[in-house]
């Protein structure tokens, strides 16, 4: 079996979708002939058990289309799997594939959750829905949800009822249990730094509880837009808790698991 996965970015700063593609390829690539198609970025991750192809972005429409069609012709996949929504490249690769009668699976990765749709609703989401995104959802052969809650929200949208739930996997072989449960007074947030993650809620909550958290260290780990990170840092200063919170940037591999083991509490506030 041959499968093409299209994903707009496999850069490490893209967070969960990049990690998903890495973990998926580790196992799926053992079972099928797997090809991943994406675009050039500054810090692409290494993905094993597959062939990675880079094509031009939407800004080079003709070149992008030509190279995508070339790959379809060369690989002749049984399934084309589109990852993510709202970016024109996702809808275009789907459209070009379906014009040649390829079967499409669309994985929104939470990008059709209510909070995401409401964000920039009139300026971005409505134009995208009218131009391409609604049609892409309707015409996909299957939508892939990762949880029942996501499926329920996709059904509420009402564009496509062919939805299958497949949870995201995690590689557990290299994860070891904590050797000590001694309290270290460390709280951890670890994810992509993005407004949808609700980090401001965490910061505001810490400000309310700062008298009870005097000896605690709150680590906020992850990469994201520098302007937004600076906004969050400024918020900690305004609330008088800058000395409680440490922004430590992106962490990966063993360093990530080390932070989890050292933390007494992991917090992931989110809008979706």
Where are these regions (language model features)?
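A conserved mid-protein helix/loop that constitutes part of the nucleotide-sugar donor-binding site
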Residues: 19, 23, 185, 189-211, ...
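Short alpha-helical donor nucleotide-sugar binding micro-motif in glycosyltransferases
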Residues: 250-251, 258-263
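Carbohydrate-associated surface elements
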Residues: 40, 149, 169
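N-terminal subdomain of nucleotide-sugar transferases
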Residues: 1-43, 48-50, 253
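Aromatic "clamp/platform" in nucleotide-sugar-dependent glycosyltransferases that forms part
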Residues: 271-272
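Nucleotide-activated donor-binding/catalytic signature segment of Leloir-type glycosyltransferases, i.e.
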Residues: 230-251
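Acidic anion/phosphate-binding donor-loop and adjacent secondary structure
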Residues: 155, 165-184
């Amino acid at each position: 079996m041959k499968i093409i996965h299209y994903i707009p970015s496999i850069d490490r700063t893209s967070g969960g979708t990049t990690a998903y593609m890495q973990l998926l390829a580790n196992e799926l690539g053992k079972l099928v002939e797997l090809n991943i198609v994406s675009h050039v970025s500054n810090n692409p991750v290494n993905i094993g058990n597959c062939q990675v192809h880079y094509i031009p972005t939407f800004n080079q429409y003709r070149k992008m289309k030509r190279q995508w069609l070339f790959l379809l012709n060369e690989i002749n996949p049984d399934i084309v799997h589109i990852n993510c929504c709202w970016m024109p490249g996702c809808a275009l690769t789907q459209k070009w594939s379906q014009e040649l009668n390829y079967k499409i699976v669309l994985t929104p990765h939470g990008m059709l959750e209510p909070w995401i749709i409401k964000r920039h609703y009139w300026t971005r989401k409505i134009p995208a829905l009218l131009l391409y995104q609604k049609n892409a959802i309707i015409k996909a052969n299957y939508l892939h949800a990762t949880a029942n809650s996501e499926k329920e929200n996709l059904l509420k949208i009402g564009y496509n009822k062919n939805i299958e739930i497949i949870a995201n996997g995690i590689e557990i072989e290299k994860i070891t249990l904590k050797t000590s449960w001694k309290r270290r007074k460390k709280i951890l947030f670890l994810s992509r730094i993005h407004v949808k993650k609700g980090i401001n809620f965490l910061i505001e909550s810490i400000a309310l509880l700062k008298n009870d958290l005097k000896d605690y260290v709150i680590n906020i780990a992850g990469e994201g837009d520098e302007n937004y990170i600076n906004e969050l840092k400024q918020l900690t200063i305004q609330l008088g808790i800058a000395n409680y919170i440490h922004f430590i940037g992106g962490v990966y591999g063993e360093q990530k698991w080390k932070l989890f083991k050292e933390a007494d509490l992991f917090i992931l506030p989110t809008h979706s």
